[in-house]
């Protein structure tokens, strides 16, 4: 979309073409994060041309179950599933149209998301979804009853660490405007799940909520 807008001369907000492309491609962004020593969940890429019988041993060797399966290029947690060994095959069928997907180790712990606005560390929010995780329904359905906790209960040192990682990731990809980085906080470590260059701006969305808490109206 950013490329189309640039070609027809229409200004737009948030990140440009290259940063947006890097962020939406989870494999590319993960490689960048690994190169710069950003802690992320272990993962493998799976092609549906590969034999499924080889996948289970590969997962067990790499990180074990449960796992998270997800498309390489999607947003809003569309077609993201937490799987164990017994239901992995059935869940994979739902992602077959993508041809290639990512399979990640499942990191338990607290779900915390942090927002950057330009060169400012805007703030963070913790999520406690009633569902298994903060999926599409939890994000966009008011009946999902996800608890939003702000301010986040972290020490000043850990909060500063969280915001520094978020700012670093924002800059590594060359982002501008607003970004939101999604983390799991487990055993005193922040695991970066992904960065969103077009974070939601609905009534249930997180960046507006963080902004209002910081005294910025949307």
PLM regions: where:
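A short, GP-enriched loop/loop-strand-helix hinge that lies immediately N-terminal to
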Residues: 1-24, 39-45
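Conserved metal-phosphate-binding beta-hairpin within the catalytic cores
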Residues: 5, 105, 114, 170-201, ...
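Active-site nucleotide/adenylate-binding loops and adjacent lid/helix of ATP-dependent enzymes
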Residues: 21-109
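Short, intrinsically disordered, charge-balanced linker/junction segments flanking boundaries
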Residues: 41, 215-218
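Phosphate-binding site of ATP-dependent enzymes
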Residues: 84-158, 185-191
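A short, polar/charged loop-to-alpha-helix boundary motif
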Residues: 132-138, 202-210
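Internal helical hairpin/lid segments
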Residues: 144-149, 158-179
């Amino acid at each position: 979309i950013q490329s189309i807008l640039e070609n027809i001369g229409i200004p737009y907000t948030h990140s440009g073409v290259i940063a947006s492309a890097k962020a939406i491609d989870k494999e590319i962004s993960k490689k960048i994060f690994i190169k710069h020593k950003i802690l992320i969940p272990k993962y493998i890429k799976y092609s549906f041309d590969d034999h499924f019988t080889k996948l289970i041993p590969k997962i067990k060797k790499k990180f074990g179950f449960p796992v998270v399966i997800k498309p390489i290029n999607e947003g809003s947690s569309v077609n993201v599933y937490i799987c164990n060994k017994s239901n992995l095959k059935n869940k994979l069928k739902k992602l077959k149209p993508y041809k290639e997907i990512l399979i990640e180790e499942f990191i338990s712990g607290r779900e915390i998301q942090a927002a950057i606005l330009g060169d400012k560390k805007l703030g963070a929010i913790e999520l406690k979804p009633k569902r298994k995780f903060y999926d599409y329904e939890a994000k966009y359905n008011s009946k999902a009853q996800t608890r939003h906790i702000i301010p986040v209960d972290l020490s000043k040192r850990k909060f500063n660490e969280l915001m520094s990682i978020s700012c670093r990731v924002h800059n590594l990809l060359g982002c501008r405007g607003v970004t939101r980085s999604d983390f799991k906080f487990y055993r005193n470590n922040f695991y970066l799940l992904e960065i969103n260059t077009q974070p939601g701006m609905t009534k249930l969305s997180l960046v507006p909520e963080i902004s209002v808490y910081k005294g910025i109206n949307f």
